[in-house]
Amino acid sequence: MSAVHLASLSRRGGENDQFPFTVPAIRALDGLPLERPVTFFVGENGSGKSTLLEGIAAAARLATVGSAEVQQDDTLAAQRRLGKALRLSWARRTTRGFFLRAEDFFGFAKWLARMRAELIVEMREAAELYKAGGRSQTALGLKQGPLQASIAELEKRYGAELDANSHGESFLKLFQSRFVPGGLYLLDEPEAPLSPQSQLSLLAMIGDMISQDAQFIIATHSPLLLAFPDAQIYSFDRIPVQAVAYEELDHVRITRDFLNAPNRYLTQILKKDPPLH
């Protein structure tokens, strides 16, 4: 198993009466070892798992796949405060990798499409301008060369129309193009646009990348992703945050029980009976 880049994190400040330090899991955060190449943060919505992931992204100054970097995103001001209060302990510092919130991805895809369209328009305008001015094809080529190179690089990395694919296809294509060896990847609920089959494809990509010295920290609700072999799982439903086994997770137990007896579950739920225990 490959060694990790980010070995642990701890909190070293922050006002407990101000969000996000009012979140119980964040308030109680002391030290959190990150001993394995794949770490999962799991918990109910509002438990703090995504907030901590965003704080780590701010502290690590990772590139962001989204419409704005963590350092400039107006919606992440509180998470930047958290980032300043976190102490990251590195085994091997890496500047490779990225932070991704599933909810931001489609804004990113639209931004890529807009950038490509603007480059194409600029090329056409240059051609018209140079033709009207009687400029040579050589001069036009010198003008258009960098624009063509930028378009080619975008298409090489993301395809000609990333936003034209299905959500799941676009997501997986992004991962294929942006995962590089030796990177740190912070993924917030990456299962959101993915079918079960696509989640298995993502697991395969993660397995391939950790064999190339990558590290992943993932906030998720997905029992499929959480099943990754030898992953560290931290529950944010326990205060302080605690490591838990896969079989102990409510996400796993409830999903398994439901699939084993869906009619029994649905009968009780639809009759508004007390929840099953």
What is the predicted role of each segment?
Residues 26-36, 177-181, 208:
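Phosphate-binding P-loop
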Residues 36-70:
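Phosphate-binding glycine-rich loops of NTP-binding sites
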Residues 197-215, 222-277:
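C-terminal lobe/lid and adjacent interdomain/linker elements of RecA-like ASCE P-loop ATPase modules
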Residues 188, 218-219:
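Conserved D-loop beta-strand region of ABC ATPase nucleotide-binding domains
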Residues 62-90:
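Flexible phosphate/Mg2+-sensing switch loops adjacent to catalytic phosphate-binding sites
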Residues 98-102, 111, 117-201:
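Conserved ABC ATPase signature
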Residues 39, 191-194, 207:
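Catalytic acidic motif of RecA-like/P-loop NTPases
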Residues 1-30:
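N-terminal pre-Walker A segment at the start of P-loop NTPase domains
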